Amino acid sequence: MPTFKLVLSDPMSGKARQFEVKDPLAQRFIGLKIGDELDGQVLKELIELPKGAKVKITGGSGIEGAPMHPGIPGPVKRYVLADSRPGYHPPKRGMKKKKLMRGNTISDTIVQINAVVVYPEGYAGPPAIPLGAKELQKEKKTEEAPAQ
């Protein structure tokens, strides 16, 4: 019985929301890889996405906190000599470090899945994740400022 935290980012609004994904919906994520796209209507019980929208898997992390790496095949854990992203940001150029990383495939040991909404081409409607109250107030203030 896998349970995931799905962090869904919306490029249109610049916002992200976190959802708790449990069975049977969580079973649909098992076996997917980084870069795979899922139909947005699968998540209709969590969030209302526009018709034709897709959800693209961009990464995640395991139960021990190790990030998923797109270059490691399968649902495995490996120690990798990392010198750049993803999963390691060296403080100095050229530095390398041995890091624990997960493979690119989602399994039941993954805790968090990162994903982004991919809108259909030519979509001009409202964003799937709306702006909050603070952002709306900021927009109103910026609209009022030039009118003075």
UniProtKB/Swiss-Prot annotation:
GO terms for cellular component: ribonucleoprotein complex; ribosome. Keywords: Ribonucleoprotein, Ribosomal protein. GO terms for biological process: translation. GO terms for molecular function: structural constituent of ribosome. SMART domains: Ribosomal_S6e. Belongs to the eukaryotic ribosomal protein eS6 family. This is Small ribosomal subunit protein eS6.
